[in-house]
Amino acid sequence: MPKLNSTQAPNLFLLLLVILLCSTQTQCHTKGLRLRPRNQKNMNTTSDRTQNPEDEFMKWVRFVGSLKHSVFKAAKNKLFPSYTLTVHKKSNKGDFTKIQDAIDSLPLINFVRVVIKVHAGVYKEKVSIPPLKAFITIEGEGAEKTTVEWGDTAQTPDSKGNPMGTYNSASFAVNSPFFVAKNITFRNTTPVPLPGAVGKQAVALRVSADNAAFFGCRMLGAQDTLYDHLGRHYYKDCYIEGSVDFIFGNALSLYEGCHVHAIADKLGAVTAQGRSSVLEDTGFSFVKCKVTGTGVLYLGRAWGPFSRVVFAYTYMDNIILPRGWYNWGDPSREMTVFYGQYKCTGAGANYGGRVAWARELTDEEAKPFLSLTFIDGSEWIKL
């Protein structure tokens, strides 16, 4: 068997990393393999780059290689050095004035932990992180000081004049793995829609990749605020605000110490979890959270026939409907969903009026949902 020469080896190494980290055909993790939905649109990467991706990548690494930073496991970050970029409203005080410009400046294929520090201000822009630009951290000066916002809805025309749909309405879209956000607000400025309004889904944040973590962030919107789409995600000490189905998707996510706040005029719902098969290891777990707000709320609606949501050690205000859960108008889903409650408090936590197909969990039943093991967090999160 012929030996690889010195120029072939780096190419092969990069190719293997691309295949392992950035496959566009599946979303997988250690607990299962999930095919992408057929109707999911892939996000195209920048098409106007003409340099060899490896040359471009190594040039950038040499330029900033002396800077140091680490968020996730040191083993992964030892592959290449990491560095920091700054975004500031004033061009003479930062590297960039827009968050998207900072992201676009990175090499086409990125394996370096890049920390983008965003100074205080409201950044009115629509931001999307392409699938191959992994290991990005967005860090604000405080969730109440640093905001990125846009105002698209599912009805907003795209470049071809067609409605862009819920998926593309996101003000901020994460499509690459190992993303971290700290102390920043993601907002969709669309007002609360009238009951029964069509096409008013307006996503503030969409997370469509594995191994994403959010610390001290705010997600502000109305209908469909947080599209917790695919992958394993961790939300710590975050504030999430909306009206109807404002935490939805088919991710495997742990919400710890988060404040969930409803701004519904009348009837709303916190979650719409989309698990569609018993083989899918997805679901939402809320641990030591707080649910407050206006209107009256379901804890969740069965968007997927095997929808799975658990609330544990969570305070619930009196806005929670006694029934707690809604079957999406399909009684057959009552046999397949998994909706649980464990040692919750507050006027809205009274289990006496809950639907018969919800569960008051025992210690043993609740245990898998209470810690980072729910999302294999010890493998990829460094707190």
Swiss-Prot record:
GO terms for molecular function: pectinesterase activity. Substrate binds at T166, Q201, R301, W303. Residues 1-28 form the signal peptide. Expressed in siliques. Keywords: Aspartyl esterase, Cell wall, Cell wall biogenesis/degradation, Glycoprotein, Hydrolase, Secreted, Signal. The active site is at D224, D245. Pathway: Glycan metabolism; pectin degradation; 2-dehydro-3-deoxy-D-gluconate from pectin: step 1/5. GO terms for biological process: cell wall modification; pectin catabolic process. Glycans are attached at N44, N183. The record marks Q223 as: Transition state stabilizer. Belongs to the pectinesterase family. This is Probable pectinesterase 53. It comes from Arabidopsis thaliana.
